[in-house]
């Protein structure tokens, strides 16, 4: 059995779990997420805990039970608490402005960048150089943050660009004469 799958997922109060024929549906105050069921993994729901067991002793079934447990754990946390990613813009003239589901970025290019948020992700800009992304799906929030960072990744000489809050950018030394 997978080491990850050995620990059951505790379902907090206010989170509803439904078993369908093809998917596990998790509902909470932040929305609803579904997880497609895999034939190698059996899911048991007892006393507010979700347990994941491999249907057979193959390597793939063990791996899938651990993967399923990790994904469902993130879904339970997402619908109850939500996920947040913070980005900061470092550089002269680098600006961000949120207007509903649209993020306008000025990153030193000759044109502004207009990024439309996907379903389930909301954006806020507390200041012109800070972006806060929130949502219930961890994968989608992380993907959006990575796409925004990719517009102007931090460069190694001055550190200018879009970076995650707390990210350490390894700086290079300038060429010596």
Swiss-Prot record:
Q: Which domain of life is it from?
A: Bacteria
What's one GO MF term for it?
structural constituent of ribosome
Q: GO terms for CC?
A: cytosolic large ribosomal subunit
Which InterPro entries does the entry link to?
Ribosomal_uL6-like (IPR000702), Ribosomal_uL6-like_a/b-dom_sf (IPR036789), Ribosomal_uL6_a/b-dom (IPR020040), Ribosomal_uL6_bac-type (IPR019906), Ribosomal_uL6_CS (IPR002358)
Query: What keywords are assigned to this protein?
Result: Ribonucleoprotein, Ribosomal protein, RNA-binding, rRNA-binding
Pfam (any one): Ribosomal_L6
Please give the biological process terms from Gene Ontology that the record holds: cytoplasmic translation
Keyword check for GTP-binding, yes or no.
no
Indicate the quaternary assembly: Part of the 50S ribosomal subunit.
Q: Which NCBIfam families is this protein grouped with?
A: L6_bact
Q: Which family does it belong to?
A: Belongs to the universal ribosomal protein uL6 family.
Described purpose of this protein according to its UniProt entry: This protein binds to the 23S rRNA, and is important in its secondary structure. It is located near the subunit interface in the base of the L7/L12 stalk, and near the tRNA binding site of the peptidyltransferase center.
Please report the name of this protein according to its UniProt entry: Large ribosomal subunit protein uL6
Which lineage? Bacteria, Pseudomonadati, Pseudomonadota, Betaproteobacteria, Neisseriales
Gene name linked to the record = rplF
């Amino acid at each position: 059995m997978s080491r990850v799958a050995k620990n059951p997922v505790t379902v907090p109060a206010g989170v509803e779990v439904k078993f369908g024929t093809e998917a596990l549906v998790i509902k909470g105050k932040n929305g609803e997420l579904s997880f497609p069921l895999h034939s190698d993994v059996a899911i048991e729901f007892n006393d507010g805990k979700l347990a994941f067991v491999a249907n057979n002793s193959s390597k793939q079934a063990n791996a899938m039970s651990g993967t399923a447990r990790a994904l469902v754990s993130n879904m339970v946390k997402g619908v109850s608490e939500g996920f947040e990613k913070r980005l900061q813009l470092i550089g002269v003239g680098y600006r961000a402005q949120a207007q509903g589901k649209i993020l306008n970025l000025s990153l030193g290019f000759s044109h502004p960048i207009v990024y439309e948020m996907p379903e389930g992700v909301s954006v806020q800009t507390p200041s012109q150089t800070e972006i806060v992304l929130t949502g219930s799906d961890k994968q989608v929030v992380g993907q959006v943050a990575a796409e925004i960072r990719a517009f102007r990744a931090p460069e190694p000489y001055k550190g200018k660009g879009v970076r995650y809050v707390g990210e350490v950018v390894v700086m290079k030394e300038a060429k010596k004469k």
